[in-house]
Each structure stands twice: as structure tokens, then as C-alpha cells.
Amino acid sequence: GALVAQCIHQKHTYKEYAGLDACAANLMRPAMYGAYHHITVLGKENALCDHTYDVTGGLCENNDKFAVDRNLPQIDIGDYVYIHDTGAHGFSMGYNYNAKLRSAELLLCEDGSVEMIRRAETPKDYFATFDFTGLFDNIK
């Protein structure tokens, strides 16, 4: 399996950061125990890996990183990155921290077709287990 995410932020300080629209809630292994996942910048597969990035998610946690000091081609806002070998770890280890919703899962079939095997979570899913009974009874 793979996680496909888009670069939506950049930060240029003492380090170069590429911020994705995915986060540790989508793939916990790098944040949890530093697991390595190869990263490909789609459309730049043959470009030189002459930039060094921390590839991060959008959570407010310092360990929300898919890669640290990773040599990659230049990543521009809007580029898609392909995080390899995520297997079944995405959804099974996923969580809703900071109200992050789980993403859809797609299956690439042997004939090249793509099927959605799990839809993305919605806010309705997120709040489905809350019991709002009586919550606003004392508010005037």
C-alpha cells in the first residue's frame, strides 16, 4: 500500500520543511517509532535528490513527520508525494487526533482499474458516537 499526499505548506528556516495534507493520523509508524518509508515526488521520479527536507504533517506535534533530513527532488506547493510501503498500517493505526478524519482507501487492481474500498470519514462519522442528549438543556 501507499499514502498519496499533496504538499500544501513550505517553511524555509534553518531547515527546509515540506508540509503535507496528510499527517501522523494517516500513517503513525514514522511518528511512533521512526519507521522509514521511501518517498517519491510524483512527476519528478528522475530528478536529482538535491534538496534536504523534513516532510511533515499538519498536527501540532513535533513528531508529526514522515521523513527527517531526507534527500528528495525539489518539492513545490501542489506536488504530490507517494509514501511507499504503508500496507495496512494507515487505517488500522489511524486516529482522530485534532479532529483529523481518516482518508479514503483505494485499491489498484491487477487490470489497472482503481476501486474505492473504504470511503473517507465525514464529520457525521466523527460525531456519530457522541450522545448529545440533554447537552443544551440548561442553556437559555
Model-derived regions: residue spans:
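Charged (often Lys/Glu-rich) extended helix/loop segments that serve as interaction or gating elements
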Residues: 1-140
